[in-house]
Amino acid sequence: MNWYEKLSEYFPIEEMKSKAHMEALLKERSDIYHKDEGKHHILMFAEFDSFIFVDYLYVSKDARGQGLGGKLIAKLKKKNKPILLEVEPVDEDDTDTEKRLRFYQREHFKHAQSIGYRRRSLATNEVNKMEILYWSPKTESEEEILEAMKQTYENIHTYKDEKWYGESYEKTDEVLEIIDEEKQKNIFDQLS
């Protein structure tokens, strides 16, 4: 099974980019978009001047629980930049959602509670609510995290989207926003 098939098998369709989109990022945006692949893992990430965005982190079933994911995150942390990623809310029908969240909690990621993130999947046409997690070597404001996510959305997620999907994703300001304080909830509180 190739790297794309492994990612497609593990991640929900609404979170997956097309293979052509990812290959174009690797080829045409090799200055920022990278693939770290080994026998038991795939790490897709974008490294910008001031932050890193983890697009996909996959560890094979037989290697989970052996510290490989932590080693991959530690390698990124050594770059001494904030690390951002997206996670889906806990789904009781999918135990992996809670396991992923626990992993990032162990790795000292914080939830950007003030950032609302909803984007329509061009594969399913459904709107998906995602949460933003981040780790930083210094104190970052959630406004700075929001600006980094906007940069990611515009340079990675929507890169040549019409070419790959036949239509465009929504505009950045329709997808990412600061939400009212009374609506903010810490996703880590969902863990049992």
From Swiss-Prot:
Per UniProt, residues of the N-acetyltransferase domain are 1-139
Source species, domain of life: Bacteria
A GO molecular function for this record?
Answer: acyltransferase activity, transferring groups other than amino-acyl groups
Q: Which SUPFAM superfamilies does UniProt cross-reference here?
A: Acyl-CoA N-acyltransferases (Nat)
- What does the UniProt keyword field contain? Acyltransferase, Cytoplasm, Transferase
Q: What is its EC number?
A: 2.3.1.-
What switches on expression, per the entry, is described as: By different stresses, such as ethanol, salt, and phosphate starvation, in a partially sigma-B dependent manner. Transcribed under partial control of SigM ECF sigma factor.
Where in or outside the cell it occurs: the entry states: Cytoplasm
Q: What happens when the gene is disrupted?
A: Cells lacking this gene display decreased survival rates during salt stress conditions.
Q: Its GO CC terms?
A: cytoplasm
| CDD domains associated with the record | NAT_SF (cd04301)
* Enzyme class name: transferase
Q: InterPro entries, from UniProt?
A: Acyl_CoA_acyltransferase (IPR016181), GNAT_dom (IPR000182)
Residues passing through the membrane, by range = none
Name the UniProt record assigns to this protein: Putative acetyltransferase YjbC
